[in-house]
Amino acid sequence: MRKLNLGCGGNILAGWENHDADLDITKPLPYKDNSIDFIFAEHVVEHTTTPDAVRFFTESYRILKPDGILRIAVPSVDKIYDLADGPYLKWHGQSGFGDGSKRKAVQSILLDHGHLSAWNHSILEACFFAAGFDPDKICGCGFSELEGHGKVIGDHNNEIETIIMEAVK
């Protein structure tokens, strides 16, 4: 089984091909058609424009084998807006990204951290569809041992910030 972990940072997964800045997801991916079983990209797609993200999803579709899985984790503007609570807002303010208000937390996800695109469930699903994935094979997912972002910002904060979705070729 061939698995790619793209934009891995320090989240190195055993048994995976782990790539960070060495592989530019805004360019054609250097893999043959139908050659990959699983692609995981955690908190990387928001660092591209939406058109570049759709191109990346299209490239992922090309290189995935039939029934291959693309798993994406991105910050969710909706979740931050809806779920931001006292502990999250306190952490956010103490992290230097705002003043502890919900408004600054939402602004930060949109404007800081090198983010070039904003995401929620509907946008992610529409972009998967535009890239060729069947809407019946797109599903939201819970957290698993793959995600490493919670190790950086804490599991509670990660649950508030992150949406995870899979698409099956």
Can you name each region flagged by the protein language model?
Residues 2-81, 165-169:
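Conserved SAM-binding loop
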